[in-house]
A protein has these predicted regions:
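Noncatalytic alpha-helical scaffold of FAD-dependent oxidoreductases
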Residues: 1-188
């Protein structure tokens, strides 16, 4: 059985805290935990046909999480719902959607798998795979974002990745005006 969920969080710190909460509540059944910034979702929705926002409200960060077990289909729905309710009570999440069907689950994972294409549609990116201790992911993103914005005004920073193992994709994307003009992006 597999139960994917799309979860809105306020920031990377809430995402890391949510991972700890879900592991405490669901143990080893947490099989995937992807932190995704809103900026790359916007690139996906505008640049790659066939995708739609899973939630009506816009949030700054999301988690695509999957829990799996050898049990029958649907056996994880109750425990996942309870764990998410507890996370909401603790203020860790803003909203959550548990995939209601195999089709919806596939759409959520197709979004994650299309993030590289989204960056290409925005004029390309400078991809980085960064290994960071899980507890330091929020600090890394905060410091990297600040350094990029200070050096390259208007740059779009796209962070997403496997929080559970500390592997993040941190991919700056050219400012929209430069990407649209197809001009080189050179440091000031």
């Amino acid at each position: 059985a597999s139960e994917p969920a799309w979860i809105a969080v306020s920031d990377p710190q809430a995402g890391v805290q949510l991972l700890a909460h879900m592991r405490k509540m669901l143990g080893d059944s947490v099989s995937a935990f992807e932190l995704i910034c809103r900026a790359i979702i916007d690139l996906l929705l505008t640049g790659v046909p066939g995708h739609e926002d899973p939630m009506q409200a816009v949030h700054p960060w999301y988690v695509l999480m999957d829990v799996t077990s050898q049990g029958p289909p649907g056996s994880l729905h109750g425990p996942l719902s309870d764990a998410l309710a507890g996370a909401q009570e603790e203020g860790l999440i803003r909203d959550a959607l548990i995939a209601a069907s195999g089709t919806q689950a596939a759409r959520l994972w197709r979004m994650r798998e299309s993030l590289a294409e989204a960056q290409l549609s925005a004029g390309g990116s400078i991809p980085h795979d960064v290994s960071v201790p899980v507890s330091r992911i929020p600090e890394f993103i905060r410091r990297a974002d600040a350094a990029l914005v200070a050096t390259y005004p208007g740059i779009r920073h796209c962070a997403f990745g496997h929080v559970g193992d500390g592997n993040m994709h941190y991919n700056p994307v050219r400012p929209a005006a430069i990407a649209a003009a197809s001009t080189p992006f050179v440091a000031p």
